[in-house]
Amino acid sequence: MAQKRPACTLKPECVQQLLVCSQEAKKSAYCPYSHFPVGAALLTQEGRIFKGCNIENACYPLGICAERTAIQKAVSEGYKDFRAIAIASDMQDDFISPCGACRQVMREFGTNWPVYMTKPDGTYIVMTVQELLPSSFGPEDLQKTQ
């Protein structure tokens, strides 16, 4: 299947704002166990930005990633159409990449929207949700019958 470019192409100033917001969100991370703060900034179709950070728990499986925090905040306020998400960490040498669970949650809300994966110096790479999670299972698959 041919890959499509993101349905939403953001203006450079919008990308920059999203990157800054993801860095700001990282400052709120609660990560006393991993010491690995992550921030995310999610842009809705309406232009709102929802920030999220990772929140760990002594019962490790109960922690939540920054991306899912941002998405859950947006959905809980009635937003379900997303234009882009930016993710930030303190990794100097590598771009932060969403985990598999976050990729699946992002996919719930579409495949053709951009994910900006950053470094602290402001550089980034961008991929669509489809590129991050090819051949994925989504809501429309539940409607298929044999």
Curated annotation (Swiss-Prot):
Name the record gives this protein: Cytidine deaminase
EC number, UniProt record: 3.5.4.5
Native organism taxonomy: Eukaryota, Metazoa, Chordata, Craniata, Vertebrata
Assembly mode: Homotetramer.
Domain of life: Eukaryota
InterPro entries cross-referenced by the UniProt entry: APOBEC/CMP_deaminase_Zn-bd (IPR016192), CMP_dCMP_dom (IPR002125), Cyt/Deoxycyt_deaminase (IPR050202), Cyt_deam_tetra (IPR006262), Cytidine_deaminase-like (IPR016193)
Annotated SUPFAM superfamilies: Cytidine deaminase-like
Gene: CDA
Catalytic activity: cytidine + H2O + H(+) = uridine + NH4(+); 2'-deoxycytidine + H2O + H(+) = 2'-deoxyuridine + NH4(+)
Domain CMP/dCMP-type deaminase per the UniProt entry, residue ranges: 13-140
Keyword terms of this UniProt record: Hydrolase, Metal-binding, Zinc
Residues that, per the record, bind substrate: N54, I55, E56, N57, A58, C59, Y60
Expressed in which tissues: Highly expressed in granulocytes while expression is very low in fibroblasts, chondrocytes, monocytes, and T- as well as B-cell lines.
EC primary class: hydrolase
Positions bound to Zn(2+): C65, C99, C102
